[in-house]
Amino acid sequence: EYSEIIEAKKKLIEGINNGTDDRCAGCFALKERDWDNIEDEELNSISVENHSLCNMKCSYCSDVYYGGVEPQYSLEHLFEGLNDVGDDLHIAWGGGEPTVRKDFNDLFLSLNEKFHPKTQRVFTNALKYSRVLQEALDSRSTSITTSIDAGVEDTFRKVRDSKGLDKVLQFLERYSQNSPDLITIKYIFTVD
């Protein structure tokens, strides 16, 4: 439950303050000041990355992201008791590949219905088409980022350990039909 996250955060802060926890030692963002109670903080960011399911195995990636680990807990259960979020809530979807989750469409719809995020971004390889994602793009309630990493199938296969560049490009064309400004395409350059 979300209350467990708050308790863990309290413990971490207490440990930092009394010197028994050094996980944040040396961090430039660590500041000494009077802070509001954690319970009074607004939740402004949710990053959905509780799995490592992926339909590719990119040469620059690690098995942390493509290792095939199913979600270890229910996000719907986690957010069950959470009703208040900040007005500037942003949701980021990653993983692994978010769209290969069996529950992606339902989870995407339920989190959007419950929280009405101000912005959200789905980091997808676009190898699998999602009607729910298409509808969110068409209604301008999400954006996507896709790393293509190649211009031809041979290079795509070498970098991604997967065929499907044409399929990815077709899906990106469909996704961008109504709101091309919400689609970011990037390339990651490697020495290979």
Spans of model-derived segments:
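N-terminal pre-core extensions flanking Radical SAM catalytic domains
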Residues: 1-68, 83-85
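Residues that form or flank phosphate/diphosphate-binding pockets in enzymes
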Residues: 34-35, 102, 131-132
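Core AdoMet radical
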Residues: 43-53, 62-74, 86-101, 112-130, ...
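Short amphipathic alpha-helix with an adjacent loop that forms part of the alpha/beta core around
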Residues: 78-84, 134-137
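Generic structural signal for well-ordered alpha-helices
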Residues: 105-108, 134, 169-173
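A generic structural signal for well-ordered alpha-helical segments enriched in polar/charged residues
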Residues: 113, 174-177
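Acidic (Asp/Glu)-rich catalytic clusters
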Residues: 135-141, 176-177
